[in-house]
Amino acid sequence: MKIGIIGATGYGGAEIMRIMRTHPYADECILYSSSDEGARYDAAYPHLVKLTDQHLQPIEVKRIANEIDFLFMAAPPGISSRLTPQFDAYDIPIIDLSGDLRIQNPSVYEKWYKREAAPEHVLQKAVYGLSELNREDIKTAQYIANPGCFPTAVLLGLAPLVKSGSINESFVIIDAKTGVSGAGRKPSMGTHFSEVNDNFKIYKVNEHQHTPEIEQTVKQWNSAFKPITFSTHLVPMTRGIMATIYTELKDSMDAEQLQLIFSKFYKDSYFVRVRETGSFPATKEVYGSNFCDIGVTVDERTNRVTIVSVIDNLMKGAAGQAVQNFNIMNGLSETAGLEFTPIYP
């Protein structure tokens, strides 16, 4: 199968390239870029010297459609909403890693992303690619809206209790931390080494664009849920997300009962690892892998639950989940090309 990657010079695109280089069902990866067309790919990423000698190709829709079988879009927001409608006539399956296809209501997208939404007919065709929860819809989809990094960690952490009706629909607080690669490769003052090193800061308070994505999905599972409280923090590390989620049980249960709910819920999900009671994950334990590790407990004094969910933001939070969705769409094993051991230490 010939694979195309638009936005190959960004971190998400580079991570897809890393995975698909050795994927058993990818015969060739063709790389496209609007900013560096014609350049050697290993000039943008010297760690790929001797691993690829490809040049970056221009983004020309008709040409791309004629030379690939499957397309990953790893470009910044605003690109996919413009390009995806142009591929409609070619019946090319697409996985989009930006937020352009995730929000079903165009006015909600425009409020949070501050840009024009994709055409409604494209949004209606897009399936939300939370692999463990939407497998059946993903199998037959033409367009996949790959989930954001924070929503992936948060929603995998919340799903067992939301879907079982176990928690108070008015009480969900999410305190999330991310490494700097989540901001992308383009330099900025906020992610400059001197600004990030030895520092820890909150950002986009009450304004993070992943808020409506989380709320939209939770309300699809249970329409009674009220708006959530969601805060994000930047920590001085390259990769990783930790989402600490606080919620309240409707009925009393102990930590062992909670752990059993999570273990049963994810028993057929290879990439979700539920910790034993009393054990909680760290970001280093999923680094470079497609795993999501989850720990859960309850404070029996307050009947409030703490869920800790960790992922590698570039893998399970982006490229890894995109390839997992590629596998599902093509009837392959979900683990094909993704059985990376986490890098430790």
Curated annotation (Swiss-Prot):
* Enzyme Commission no: 1.2.1.38
Which InterPro entries does this chain map to? AGPR_AS, AGPR_type-1, NAD(P)-bd_dom_sf, NAGSA_dehydrogenase, Semialdehyde_DH_NAD-bd
Where would you find the membrane-spanning parts of this chain? Answer: none
Q: Which pathway does this polypeptide act in?
A: Amino-acid biosynthesis; L-arginine biosynthesis; N(2)-acetyl-L-ornithine from L-glutamate: step 3/4
**Annotated GO biological process:** L-arginine biosynthetic process
This entry's Gene Ontology molecular function terms read:
N-acetyl-gamma-glutamyl-phosphate reductase activity; NAD binding; NADP+ binding
Instruction: List the subcellular locations.
Output: Cytoplasm
Active site annotation, chain numbering: C149
* Record field: catalytic activity: N-acetyl-L-glutamate 5-semialdehyde + phosphate + NADP(+) = N-acetyl-L-glutamyl 5-phosphate + NADPH + H(+)
What are the alphabetically sorted keywords of the record?
Amino-acid biosynthesis, Arginine biosynthesis, Cytoplasm, NADP, Oxidoreductase
Q: Which GO terms describe its cellular component?
A: cytoplasm
What is the annotated role of this protein in its UniProt record?
Catalyzes the NADPH-dependent reduction of N-acetyl-5-glutamyl phosphate to yield N-acetyl-L-glutamate 5-semialdehyde.
**What family name appears in the similarity comment?**
Belongs to the NAGSA dehydrogenase family. Type 1 subfamily.
Q: What is this protein called?
A: N-acetyl-gamma-glutamyl-phosphate reductase
**Which gene name belongs to this protein?**
argC
